[in-house]
Amino acid sequence: MSSGDAAHMAESAASIAAASIGAVQIGEDGKPLELSALKASISEQAEHVIEKIMPRKVIRLTELYKNSKTSSHDALEVVKNGALANRGVTQLLEVLKVEILELIQYLDVLKLWVQLNIPSIQDGNNFGVSIQEEIAGMLEAGKNSGLGFLDTFTKYYATRGKLITKLNKYPNVDDYHRGIAELDEKKHLLLRHCCLDLRNNYAVLFDMITKNKDRLEKPRGLSNHISSMY
């Protein structure tokens, strides 16, 4: 490439960049309108999650926990009857998979909402900012908890598949029957625990967010009224 071509390309790139910058519209707050629109949209979504979704999820997951009881006898009967899958476990697992994916989506919205409200770094009262950072960390921890449960689902199917393969090869070995039944029972107990864990995530986060909503939206708006977030 000649120096003339390089100069021409550089000039073209500069022109494109200038055109792109020129196309950005600035709002009254001094910020690009696209970013202001994004912040407004996220705030609206976060409000819906806080006021509507989170209370409903607490009730929904509590009911799911109460309605998902089983026993070791049920799990063993599933294996003895020749079923390749434990329908009770797989149905609850699929329901919780949807619940976890929704939790992750909602917590991502709330975390972005909190982060978009964090002000510029200044000296003075940063108490509200520390609350924002604390709750953003709690939202991330809740998301990671959900992702952790998803990993256990994959491991369950892999482990059970190996046991089923051995059972088909040695159908008269009673230990394989009992091993699969024990695996199913343990998984069912963990899934019920998952119901409570998801429920508790929603409940605790809802409580913390509603108690500190003013500080989350305007962290420096209460400079003369500093108190504990708890």
Residue ranges and their predicted role:
Residues 42-61, 103, 146, 153-156, ...:
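Charged, low-complexity, helix-prone segments enriched in Lys/Glu/Asp/Gln
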Residues 68, 90-163, 167:
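Extended, amphipathic alpha-helical segments that serve as helical scaffolds
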Residues 1-87:
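N-terminal leader/presequence regions that precede the main folded/catalytic core
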Residues 78-89, 119-132, 174-190:
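Short, charged/polar, low-complexity loop and linker segments
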Residues 165-230:
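Alpha-helical oligomerization segments
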Residues 75-77, 81-84, 91, 95-115, ...:
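Long all-alpha helical scaffold domains
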